[in-house]
Amino acid sequence: MTSRRAFLAGLMAVAAPKPSWADAGSPRWLACAREADGAYALFGLAADGADTFRLPLPARGHAGAAHPTRPEAVAFARRPGAFALVLDCATGALIRDLTPPEGMQFNGHGAFTAEGDILYPVEQRATDSRGFLGIWDTAYRRIGQIETGG
């Protein structure tokens, strides 16, 4: 039987506000760019082109994938590349640094499912450039791949 304390704790957890894209300025687009000083960043852009956020990247980025329900984005390295950074766009915090499996590279793009439970980054095998969609779960662990034939 559930105790009153456990019930109230669960109720508070469910009722607590969750971060949303509004917390990150409700960007319309994500874009990777080089700044005037030569640094690279992922930008959130409003409909009028104004920056809603700017998050630094360690090297040249190519594209970003926005999580459909949380203010998170994955910034992918320029193809072929070795980084995909999961960023909290509301706080600027690095959530996770994704590393492709041994012998694989990220290929600049990715997308979440509509529910946000799976991330599909475009990957390629370094030795022969054979293409794959990686399959990464909600904890950003790689759980599989699909060969693309490319």
Residue ranges of each PLM-predicted region?
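Repeated scaffold domains used in trafficking and secretory/extracellular systems
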Residues: 59-66, 105-109, 150
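Residue-level detector of Asp-centered blade-edge/turn motifs that repeat once per structural unit
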Residues: 68-69, 114-115
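Short, solvent-exposed loop/turn segments at conserved positions within beta-propeller repeat blades
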Residues: 35-38, 78-80, 126-130
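A short beta-strand motif characteristic of beta-propeller blades
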Residues: 50-56, 93-100, 142-147
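N-terminal export signals
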Residues: 1-23
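Short loop/turn segments that connect beta-strands within beta-propeller blades
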Residues: 46-48, 89-91, 137-139
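C-terminal segment of N-terminal export signals and the immediately downstream linker at the start
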Residues: 18-45
